[in-house]
Regions:
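Nucleotide and nucleotide-moiety/phosphate-recognizing core
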Residues: 2-105, 116, 120, 124-131
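Single conserved hydrophobic/aromatic residue that forms the stacking wall/gate
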Residues: 136-144
Length: 144
């Protein structure tokens, strides 16, 4: 089983902003795979599905991005997710050019406070991160 977390900030003022690319990516997966809403647990929205024959939990923390670690840790513990092999975190990276994607298996937070909080809460830097940067236009969702 995998836990796929999209980072972002709750609230209308943050919708369709580069900072919410993690949320938008999870929303697109929910749409593409017709994932039923699982509800709210541990201050996060989540849903379960199968992707490529694997059980996947798609999650969006309802806390502000800088406090994402608590909901991620609690959800991982509840579903017995091993962060080092079953956690994927998707978020924006301001250092990437529009249209770029970077995947890392481990490492420091690189100045990203949401990742910093997840590392602090999990006690490890060893989890998969997908960093994205898309140009925001009215057609941005089609780029995901």
């Amino acid at each position: 089983m995998y836990l796929v977390v999209g980072l972002g900030n709750p609230g209308k003022q943050y919708e369709a902003t580069r900072h919410n690319m993690g949320f938008d990516t999870v929303d697109r997966l929910v749409e593409d795979y017709n994932v039923p809403q699982g509800g709210v647990k541990f201050n996060a929205m989540y849903g379960k599905t199968m992707i490529g024959g694997e059980k996947v939990i798609l999650m969006k923390p309802l806390s502000f991005m800088n406090l994402s670690g608590g909901p991620v840790r609690e959800m991982a513990n509840y579903f017995k997710i091993d962060p080092e092999s079953e956690l994927i975190v998707i978020y924006d990276d301001i250092d990437l050019e529009p249209g770029q994607l970077r995947i890392r298996k481990q490492g420091s937070a690189g100045g990203h406070n949401g990742i910093k909080d997840i590392i602090r809460q999990l006690g490890t830097e060893k989890f998969l991160r997908i960093k994205v940067c898309l140009l925001y236009t009215s057609d941005a969702a089609d780029e995901l």
